[in-house]
Amino acid sequence: MLCFFVLFFCCGTVLLEGADIDEIEHADKRRPIWNMGHMVNAVYQIDEFVDLGANAIETDVTFTKSANAEYTYHGVPCDCHRWCKKWEYVNDFLKALRRATTPGDAKYRSQLILVVFDLKTDYLTASTAYDAGKDFAKRLLQHYWNGGSNGGRAYIILSIPDLAHYKFINGFKEQLKTQGHEDLLAKVGYDFWGNEDLSSTRAAFQKAGVQDKEHIWQSDGITNCWLRTLKRVREAVANRDSSNGYINKVYYWTVDKYASVRDAINAGADGIMTNYPNVIVDVLKENDFKGKFRMATYNDNPWETFK
């Protein structure tokens, strides 16, 4: 009987502590920041970037001419001071990613809550982009979402380089509906990363059947080898905060220097894509930031605009 009460007390304490943590996070009025590890294409890099402090990662996906997702691979050129040729077969990477984001798995990393797939559709046509979207949906469903049963829990962003390839989104959504898993679209967001005019980007989303503020992240940026102003980031932030805007969240890439991270956060970015997640962690601990910003957790909805 004594053992029972001890066990009950200990388990109850753990449950209460978990509930307290959730309450604290919901009560925290600081802006959540997504610390996005850039170019995570080899399986071992998942742990590497999470260990550095990332709560999100970006992974490149290449396609064959037949519109089949093939490798997680960036290739040359890429960011300065990075090795451009790390890779995995897409299916293998998705399986490893599932383990890293499935509670209870030995490889589970609770901090990893968001994955941006940089879809290298450059060599596809507008019509084959649709086929590529269907193919990638099939692969995610099978290898990441485990057929819809106890799969990975991370939120997913489909990041497309060309507005003309909006049909990738159409194909992706229709494939999940065809296979009876339209519910998984609740975990999927969208982005065009080619730095196009915001009004043209909005029109492309509408063609893809994505309504204003329907899981839309708007990116802006350039390789870390070059400098880029925050002008378009501020335009995107203004759109996000407008009552008639189309954007939910804004992220800036690729940002490695402390001063640039500070500037991006002060400009209103929700996410910072970086080769050095520890830099973002350090900045968020600084006196000027720790009272107003924090690392995003799984309790932060990435499709809701922070107010």
Swiss-Prot record:
The keyword Phosphoprotein is annotated on this UniProt entry: no
Disulfide bridge map: 78-84, 80-225
An example Gene Ontology CC term for this record: extracellular region
Entry cofactors: Mg(2+)
Keyword Lyase: yes
Keyword tags: Cytolysis, Dermonecrotic toxin, Disulfide bond, Hemolysis, Lipid degradation, Lipid metabolism, Lyase, Magnesium, Metal-binding, Secreted, Signal, Toxin, Zymogen
Primary localisation category: secreted
Organism domain of life: Eukaryota
Sites where the protein binds Mg(2+): 58, 60, 118
E.C. designation(s): 4.6.1.-
Family to which the UniProt record says this protein belongs: Belongs to the arthropod phospholipase D family. Class II subfamily. Class IIa sub-subfamily.
Official protein name in the record: Dermonecrotic toxin LiSicTox-alphaV1
Species the sequence originates in: Loxosceles intermedia (Brown spider)
